[in-house]
């Protein structure tokens, strides 16, 4: 589907320019989705490409439909950071497909809320809960307009793991973390006749700004996926509960406990 789309958008492919090498990532959603049914067809992919825009929904839609994150409903999340380098504004954005982590480890803004959430779900508050080990997959795509070379891009992409760890991910044995970083700076034309090319490149004395931005944006994107996701019942009655519902129930429970204490 991606090859067909690229060919339709660029008649010069394989004639005046190179071939198509699409990049496709994958997350296992078999807990909620009947993956043996192969329900996604080429027309669905082409429709998604046609409707792609700068604004998009987050949570449990598209590739995020069958995702679970920290034992709750996961999905698509995004975030960004603005950077000032030598008086010039730059940006770094993160797009995350969150399908990883265990509930007992979940941490939000430094608060380790996982055990309380797990206790609530195990108490029978909601049906269909099944514990999730720290496994699955997470895909992080980082985009920036800061001019970086391939080594610098690789270094920035590795800082996505710092953001994942802030939410409680310990990168379990069966968890596949994939992070890709690209820069929109230094465009390369396929028909440039010049024998040499001169590109801008960030002085690495400033690269810590990118490292921090990558970690912060990844952390926030994972949390955004969790907060935007809605509860879903999938195949065989498997259910993934939304973080928003769990937090509301925890708040109600703690309010009731506080009232009971005052009455005593």
Language-model-detected regions and their locations in the chain:
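Alpha/propeptide regions of enzymes that mature by internal proteolysis
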Residues: 1-264
């Amino acid at each position: 589907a991606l090859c067909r789309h690229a060919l339709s958008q660029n008649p010069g492919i394989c004639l005046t320019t190179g071939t198509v090498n699409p990049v496709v990532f994958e997350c296992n959603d078999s807990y909620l989705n009947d993956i043996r049914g192969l329900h996604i067809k080429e027309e669905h992919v082409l429709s998604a490409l046609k409707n792609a825009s700068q604004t998009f929904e987050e949570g449990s839609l598209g590739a995020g439909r069958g995702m679970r994150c920290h034992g709750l409903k996961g999905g698509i999340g995004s975030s960004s950071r603005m950077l000032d380098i030598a008086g010039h504004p730059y940006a770094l954005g993160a797009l995350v497909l969150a399908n990883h982590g265990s509930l007992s480890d979940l941490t939000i803004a430094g608060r380790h809320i996982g055990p309380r959430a797990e206790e609530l779900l195990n108490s029978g508050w909601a049906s269909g809960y099944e514990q999730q080990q720290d496994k699955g997959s997470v895909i992080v795509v980082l985009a920036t307009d800061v001019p970086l070379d391939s080594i610098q891009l690789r270094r920035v992409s590795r800082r996505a793991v710092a953001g994942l760890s802030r939410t409680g991910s310990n990168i379990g044995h069966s968890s596949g973390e994939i992070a890709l970083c690209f820069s929109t700076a230094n465009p390369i034309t396929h028909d440039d006749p010049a024998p040499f090319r001169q590109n801008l490149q960030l002085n690495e004395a400033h690269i810590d700004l990118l490292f921090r931005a990558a970690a912060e944006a990844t952390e926030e994107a994972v949390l955004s996926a969790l907060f935007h996701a809605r509860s879903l019942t999938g195949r065989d009655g498997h259910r993934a509960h939304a973080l928003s519902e769990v937090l509301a129930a925890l708040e109600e429970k703690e309010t009731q406990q506080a009232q009971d204490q005052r009455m005593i």
